[in-house]
């Protein structure tokens, strides 16, 4: 189910800008790629990529792309409901719940995604590739698969008490 970005108060953060050069007879032609994360800090986050000859235009395109790829994140209080392992390519991210007051313990690109998703107390360990694109997508992959006890109970047709034992 697609999330309508116009109903959300989204904040954006540029995670990574890459410059590539095409060598031609007259010199080098530079183009830019921007990796952008958007989120409302209340359980919605998305990632997008924009490419252009100018950086601001690449960022604008990245924001538009990110708004099209929003996912909903299950949040319990200020943390995640359970430990989850996100994978994308060779990028692997382990996201773990943390007690209140811990803060966001995560490196670079992963931190941006977790903060814009609205998680205030969470730990994350980046395993495998440290490529920003793979790390961000692995984080999104993990967050999109999070489920609360209530969601699992509804899927199984049971009460929360039956699941928790």
From Swiss-Prot:
Q: Which family does it belong to?
A: Belongs to the universal ribosomal protein uS5 family.
Q: Which GO terms describe its biological process?
A: translation
The protein's matches in PROSITE patterns, at most eight in alphabetical order, are given as: RIBOSOMAL_S5, S5_DSRBD
Per the entry's comment, what about the domains? The N-terminal domain interacts with the head of the 30S subunit; the C-terminal domain interacts with the body and contacts protein S4. The interaction surface between S4 and S5 is involved in control of translational fidelity.
Lineage of producing organism: Bacteria, Bacillati, Bacillota, Clostridia, Eubacteriales
The record's section on HAMAP family has:
Ribosomal_uS5_B
Q: What is the designated name of this protein?
A: Small ribosomal subunit protein uS5
Task: Give start and end of each S5 DRBM domain.
Answer: 10-73
């Amino acid at each position: 189910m697609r999330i309508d970005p116009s109903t959300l108060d989204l904040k954006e953060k540029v995670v990574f800008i890459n410059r590539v050069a095409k060598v031609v007879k007259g010199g080098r032609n530079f183009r830019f790629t921007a990796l952008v994360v958007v989120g409302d800090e209340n359980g919605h986050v998305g990632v997008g990529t924009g490419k252009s000859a100018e950086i601001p235009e690449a960022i604008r395109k990245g924001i538009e792309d990110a708004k099209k790829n929003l996912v909903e994140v299950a949040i319990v209080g200020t943390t995640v409901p359970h430990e989850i392992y996100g994978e994308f390519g060779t990028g692997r991210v382990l996201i773990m719940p943390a007690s209140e007051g811990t803060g966001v313990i995560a490196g670079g690109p992963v931190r941006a995604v977790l903060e814009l998703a609205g998680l205030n107390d969470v730990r994350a360990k980046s395993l495998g590739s440290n490529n920003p694109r793979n790390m961000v997508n692995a984080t999104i992959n993990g967050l999109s698969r999070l489920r609360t006890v209530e969601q699992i109970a509804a899927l199984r047709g049971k009460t929360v008490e039956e699941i928790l034992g």
